[in-house]
Amino acid sequence: MKLILTAAVENLGVAGDIVEVKDGYGRNLLLPRGLAIPATPGAEKQIEGIKRAQEARAIRDLDHAREVKAQLEALEGVKVAVRTSESGKLFGSVKADDIVDAVKAAGGPNLDKRAIVLPKNLVKTTGKYQVEAKIHEGIVSRVKFEVVAA
């Protein structure tokens, strides 16, 4: 049975792939769950159009990611204000949310907190630090910030 996948299926393919599967697997699992549609000439043309649109969107996303990377690398004066003890140690640690808010406050681009890669030894004292921000697949930017007492 020839099917077009509408979602990623483990050990079979990703959305848009045309696959050949056994009749029972297609009828009893893939089609009822909406993971695939029958491969008709009209559906194949429709999938080709969707793939072209996805490729164009991926190119736009990549261009946008490069712009965000340039903005982040040019950004200066990012300060994370946190409560500290007299010795300069933080009550807790700096989290990804804090960094994202500080970047936004410094005039930088909006980032997703999941894009920030915090070091294994958490930021627990005042000073200057640097973390990575995974903006897009294959595009990583360094975010420099300073932790100051609030």
Swiss-Prot record:
Keywords: Ribonucleoprotein, Ribosomal protein, RNA-binding, rRNA-binding. GO terms for cellular component: ribonucleoprotein complex; ribosome. One of its GO terms (molecular function) is structural constituent of ribosome. GO terms for biological process: translation. Belongs to the bacterial ribosomal protein bL9 family. Binds to the 23S rRNA. This is Large ribosomal subunit protein bL9. The lineage of its organism: Bacteria, Bacillati, Actinomycetota, Actinomycetes, Mycobacteriales.
